[in-house]
């Protein structure tokens, strides 16, 4: 039985002798997109070819045909191509437009086109996004320049990039620049960007600028420059830094902060790690903020840096809307320049919170008894900058529900301002333990409000239960909690030995 195969049909004619290899197909023949029937029309088209080949006896003549690896030429194969595009979601007219934009598709094997589509789908590009990408960049299906990039995305990055990012990447006009993409990403990975974060990093940069304007050497220089201050960690938190120009932007800005710090690289790095976005501000802007604090608040350069060190956002805070009115408030409360520096070192958030936020908290403080234009009011304002207005209101309500008056709350917060900033839920648990389990009166907090700042399980419960074994219930809250862990442990050991 003689079998003819569309997948591999070859024969050679030599004279003499003559060698003939024929493989006749079964009922259907495979192509890269599926199967189609070996119709009578197809067979009638194939028969003259075979007869012609058999009757032609040129020496050393070889003929081969392969549906899967040969260009798409026959009508049936063109139909298979249209079928492939229909499965993607294109109608016939759209497919014709794509073929007109990229005629190379017709001369590319269905295997290759199908494999390219499968690779894109493995990168989570399906449905309308896939249609849009192919319609916009039909050369994506045939261009060899995409092979290395798609292989890199699938194999090395394990398909971790967001589909939207992949679409942006593969939509670039100049495909030649894609060849450097792999190198740039490998460089970031080599310097410590985890694979699971690389999509975040690339999503945050201006991708076209990174691809077109930054060479691998540029990126290497940038990372090396930032290395003494936190290097790749700063870039991971603020990827857009990669788009900055090293010589005209990053170096002058880092040098300004470093000079302000007294050339302290570690302190400079702390500022950059706390607020990498500070590098988006020009030297002129940063200098304007520093000079304002020096002139209007009477601070020295060293004092300004110490405030920047604990709260770098002061560089981004509006001078007229926030800095000026807050400093005026502190002056009205009686602070001179040294006092203002100490206050701002501990409560710098007062410089940045909104007017609405501060006005709500100021209203609560005045309601419980604080007087306007006093240092006590300022210290209380500094403490409550670390909590929300809602939490502060609930905390005051909680104290009132346990029988404390506004005067009691005022006395407690004057002695220990943090009592107004503690978390409501945590505070409720401590008050319940104090009253229900320790059997104490809530008024004891007036003498020692710092009780509310200790951790319930690891400090309050632990020490109370240890002391309960030897001293009974009547013991000072102050002595119970303020003694060091070492002294408390020794005392507990001594008591245990006496009991034995």
Curated annotation (Swiss-Prot):
Residues 1-64 form a transit peptide. GO terms for molecular function: double-stranded DNA binding; mRNA binding. One of its GO terms (cellular component) is mitochondrion. Pfam families: mTERF. GO terms for biological process: photosynthesis; regulation of DNA-templated transcription; termination of mitochondrial transcription. Disulfide bonds: none annotated. SMART domains: Mterf. Its main location: plastid. The keyword Disulfide bond does not apply. Transmembrane segments: none annotated. It comes from the Eukaryota. PANTHER family: CGI-12 PROTEIN-RELATED, TRANSCRIPTION TERMINATION FACTOR MTERF8, CHLOROPLASTIC. Belongs to the mTERF family. This is Transcription termination factor MTERF8, chloroplastic.
């Amino acid at each position: 039985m003689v079998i003819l195969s569309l997948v591999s049909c070859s024969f050679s004619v030599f004279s003499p002798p003559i060698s003939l290899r024929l493989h006749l197909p079964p009922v259907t023949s495979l192509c890269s997109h599926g199967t189609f029937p070996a119709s009578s029309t197809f067979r009638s088209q194939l028969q003259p070819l075979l007869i012609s080949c058999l009757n032609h006896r040129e020496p050393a003549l070889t003929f081969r045909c392969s549906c899967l690896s040969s260009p798409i030429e026959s009508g049936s194969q063109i139909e298979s191509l249209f079928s492939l595009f229909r499965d993607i979601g294109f109608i016939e007219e759209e497919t014709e437009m794509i073929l007109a934009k990229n005629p190379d598709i017709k001369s590319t094997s269905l295997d290759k086109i199908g494999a390219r589509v499968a690779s894109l789908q493995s990168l989570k590009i399906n449905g309308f996004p896939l249609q849009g990408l192919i319609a916009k960049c039909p050369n994506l299906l045939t261009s060899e320049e995409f092979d290395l990039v798609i292989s890199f995305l699938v194999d090395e990055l394990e398909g971790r990039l967001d589909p939207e990012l992949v679409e942006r990447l593969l939509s670039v006009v100049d495909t030649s620049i894609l060849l450097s993409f792999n190198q740039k990403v490998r460089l970031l990975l080599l310097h410590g960007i985890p694979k699971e974060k690389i999509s975040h990093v690339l999503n945050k940069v201006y991708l076209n600028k990174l691809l077109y304007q930054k060479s691998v050497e540029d990126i290497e220089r940038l990372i090396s420059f930032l290395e003494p201050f936190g290097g790749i960690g700063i870039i991971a938190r603020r990827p857009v830094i990669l788009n900055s120009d090293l010589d005209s932007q990053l170096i002058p800005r880092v040098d300004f902060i470093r000079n302000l710090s007294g050339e302290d690289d570690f302190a400079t790095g702390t500022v950059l790690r706390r607020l990498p976005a500070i590098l988006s501000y020009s030297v002129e802007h940063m200098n304007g903020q520093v000079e304002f604090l020096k002139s209007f608040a009477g601070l020295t350069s060293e004092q300004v840096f110490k405030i920047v060190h604990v709260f770098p956002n002061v560089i981004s805070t509006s001078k007229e809307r926030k800095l000026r009115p807050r400093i005026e408030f502190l002056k009205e409360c009686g602070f001179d320049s040294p006092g203002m520096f100490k206050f701002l070192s501990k409560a710098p958030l007062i410089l940045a919170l909104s007017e609405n936020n501060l006005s709500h908290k100021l209203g609560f403080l005045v309601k419980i008894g604080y007087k306007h234009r006093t240092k006590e009011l300022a210290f209380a304002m500094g403490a409550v900058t670390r909590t929300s207005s809602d939490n502060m209101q609930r905390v005051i309500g909680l104290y009132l529900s346990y029988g404390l008056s506004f005067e009691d709350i005022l006395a407690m917060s004057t002695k220990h301002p943090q009592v107004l900033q503690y978390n409501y839920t945590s505070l409720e648990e401590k008050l319940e333990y104090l009253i229900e389990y320790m059997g104490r009166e809530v008024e004891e907090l007036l003498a020692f409000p710092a009780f509310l700042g200790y951790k319930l399980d690891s400090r309050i419960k632990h020490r109370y239960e240890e002391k309960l074994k030897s001293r009974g219930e009547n013991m000072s809250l102050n002595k119970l909690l303020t003694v060091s862990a070492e002294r408390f442990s020794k005392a507990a050991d001594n008591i245990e030995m006496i009991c034995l």
